[in-house]
Amino acid sequence: MDALDASKLLDEELYSRQLYVLGSPAMQRIQGARVLVSGLQGLGAEVAKNLVLMGVGSLTLHDPHPTCWSDLAAQFLLSEQDLERSRAEASQELLAQLNRAVQVVVHTGDITEDLLLDFQVVVLTAAKLEEQLKVGTLCHKHGVCFLAADTRGLVGQLFCDFGEDFTVQDPTEAEPLTAAIQHISQGSPGILTLRKGANTHYFRDGDLVTFSGIEGMVELNDCDPRSIHVREDGSLEIGDTTTFSRYLRGGAITEVKRPKTVRHKSLDTALLQPHVVAQSSQEVHHAHCLHQAFCALHKFQHLHGRPPQPWDPVDAETVVGLARDLEPLKRTEEEPLEEPLDEALVRTVALSSAGVLSPMVAMLGAVAAQEVLKAISRKFMPLDQWLYFDALDCLPEDGELLPSPEDCALRGSRYDGQIAVFGAGFQEKLRRQHYLLVGAGAIGCELLKVFALVGLGAGNSGGLTVVDMDHIERSNLSRQFLFRSQDVGRPKAEVAAAAARGLNPDLQVIPLTYPLDPTTEHIYGDNFFSRVDGVAAALDSFQARRYVAARCTHYLKPLLEAGTSGTWGSATVFMPHVTEAYRAPASAAASEDAPYPVCTVRYFPSTAEHTLQWARHEFEELFRLSAETINHHQQAHTSLADMDEPQTLTLLKPVLGVLRVRPQNWQDCVAWALGHWKLCFHYGIKQLLRHFPPNKVLEDGTPFWSGPKQCPQPLEFDTNQDTHLLYVLAAANLYAQMHGLPGSQDWTALRELLKLLPQPDPQQMAPIFASNLELASASAEFGPEQQKELNKALEVWSVGPPLKPLMFEKDDDSNFHVDFVVAAASLRCQNYGIPPVNRAQSKRIVGQIIPAIATTTAAVAGLLGLELYKVVSGPRPRSAFRHSYLHLAENYLIRYMPFAPAIQTFHHLKWTSWDRLKVPAGQPERTLESLLAHLQEQHGLRVRILLHGSALLYAAGWSPEKQAQHLPLRVTELVQQLTGQAPAPGQRVLVLELSCEGDDEDTAFPPLHYEL
């Protein structure tokens, strides 16, 4: 088959987050691919939606069947107006709107052998087994990648056949390992020592590696990949280097990923010899039983011309009998598996198989779409070959609570597909719910779709509130499928809410654009949360997650929470008094705001991350903080004599350094940029080496420049070096923007201008302060001459126009922000012999961009939707709930029961994080003395310290006089006196914290809820 023209320019802005997952080569192959999706019920719609969002070149839809009521429970592209229309034709326009760069067409005829030759990948969903076998055989014959996917109620099935000789070019999601080189010996073998702190542990015997940036032993640079041997001390044998030049410094060693070959069986063979994706032998047996259940369901439909009726015991027993009579599965062509059939499992599958559920098709459709991408891009290992997924734990554990055939009968309702599994009574429960969704980004959009289709809050007494303060950006459109290009710049919450109402007109959804954080507790307070039945969080910040989780714990609300990073995803559920409360992963939470040590970043960087943080700080200091400082001085009209020492310190560096002279034109900006280049990468390094010479030795004889400390070398400016020129171009343009001057993007003219400019005088440049101590010392020596010079400079700045502080914007590649940071970091890497990272990775690191892809977000939303069923159904034991973690790149999915809440004790008391001490304020309101007495009499607690936030209400160690001032006051009166704030209108509880006599330091007492 011929691919589309894949040479067309890749829209990096649109696919920016996806590119961090797949890379440009894979994306080029994706946008040149042709895919056929046959079957446009809920599952097919999910597969198609994900492929369009991710930019597949051409998508052909095939489904001539008319839309029916049960489709609307999971097919978000259809509406009541589409009843009796062809599902493919009714879906085409909305799919095309998701991404105008994708050709979305409809095929109305049969699927023929000639038709299949037009595609690289063919996907069948909800197809009869006979159709699967026919199409699968033809695809296998012609080398067309083939997928078959289906869901039956709470069970899903996915089959992949990529042929007998399919090469995966890039099997893993991880970036190739790169490490800095310390030394390479001449010999056979040559021994390469990695710089201390490099990831030596991750290199393995037999790895193929390449080399770059080496000075001296240049023969290794860009040579063919070499195989390595890892020695016991962590050094690497890299082959014969006897004849190579002597190693001098620098360089990096980089892993070369090895392709892998996959051999798949055709569907007709794999039906009897199924190879299933499973994590244990128990899961293998479970999957084999589900495999037989699907085969029996196909046979039932073939015999009766219909699927089993919802919860019909007679039909279910017929399916069990058909499963018993199936030909036994085989381990090999000759060896049977000899596994017992789990008839109870098959029976349950059959009873609930008539339904179609939005969360199930979202989950399986995401996995199927990811497999399509693997087939096209040859990136990541494909499934081998069957995947079975079930969420039968959504059903009540008590058999007496299972729905009846009458409760599950078709009603001509948009929820018929869901009613067939859970019954009409459960549907009404869903419609009466009031839920809060925090975050309307990628996961939030997918959750809104699930909520709309399942009917959450769609009744007259139900409701759904969507909170998001952000506005839509173009880079959102490849994942956040409720948004369109015309929505860019509009509030996410408002657009998402309107789009969700379009999916289900009955949905009672309210958008709010106020953030949910400590500053808005007067909005999202006691009254607000009293109306909420549960919370779903779709946030990309651990700080925000922790806050929302704390509110759920405070108000005893169930929390559904999901997150993604690339093809990694998690979906977790937290139930009051049933599971543990949410805790952010310590490593992730700590890394969110933890900077590297200042001295490391400024003077002793050893990784590209260090240089990027330095470059980012340079941007802030040069183009934002200095401008804000001058503007503040202009507005305050402050003379130097009126300033205290800290103010002088604040102005000293920017005025005498960064902003020494106000530029008048583009040439002045270029001259400034060249001077700053010299300051940072030449003179600054020379001055550092005067402080710490290359031969400096510590008292114990250890060289100062050793281990992670790499001795830097000053750079010489060279207009023929693109990185040198990019720095000056970006810095000059940013300086011009800050001063309201026109810039330039002409590289040729810049080269010519630089030849004419005089070389900067190092004596006229800003002083380098190697530490805050030096800066303070410079201020201490600030005599009359320096004061006179600064006053003169301040007078010059005070009469000019205000400066424009620049706020770093990572997603606009035309503004020179990222250009400056990338160039500065790369030059810093050259100074210190550090392997640099490419522009894309630099942008990801400095912009703190989370790699994202539509498939992962859809999968975790589906998994959360399944947990929603359990939360809404009523009291369920902890064994019913599941935390889920998945890695689509490696076909990994684990679901496990949440932990129980940890129990703490103090004397006779026991509590968990879900408990609290409740004390009514009373009428008239009790005093502090009364509150303390109540706690001692009712709970046996002698309070040592009582706090409200940071306000200390009581301390047992206070003097009698101090206690006499506080004890007679009413609690709210005391709080207002100490904080200056009375309880907010509608506030029902004051939260107090206490510690008691006799407790250990680590005892965390439950919060005291003082009920107003």
Swiss-Prot record:
Residues 23-575 are annotated as: 2 approximate repeats. Its EC number is 6.2.1.-. It is an enzyme of class 6 (ligase). Gene3D superfamilies: NAD(P)-binding Rossmann-like Domain, Ubiquitin-activating enzyme E1, FCCH domain, Ubiquitin-activating enzyme E1, inactive adenylation domain, subdomain 1, Ubiquitin-activating enzyme E1, inactive adenylation domain, subdomain 2, Ubiquitin-activating enzyme E1, SCCH domain, Ubiquitin-activating enzyme E1, UFD domain. Keywords: ATP-binding, Cytoplasm, Host-virus interaction, Ligase, Nucleotide-binding, Nucleus, Phosphoprotein, Repeat, Ubl conjugation, Ubl conjugation pathway. GO terms for cellular component: cytoplasm; cytosol; nucleoplasm. Sequence repeats lie at residues 23-159, 423-575. ATP binds at residues 442-471. Induction: By DNA damage. Upon interferon-alpha exposure. ISGylated. Its main location: cytoplasm. One of its GO terms (molecular function) is ISG15 activating enzyme activity. Expressed in a variety of normal and tumor cell types, but is reduced in lung cancer cell lines. (Microbial infection) Interacts with human cytomegalovirus proteins NEC2/UL50 and UL26; these interactions inhibit ISGylation and cause proteasomal degradation of UBA7. This is Ubiquitin-like modifier-activating enzyme 7. The lineage of its organism: Eukaryota, Metazoa, Chordata, Craniata, Vertebrata.
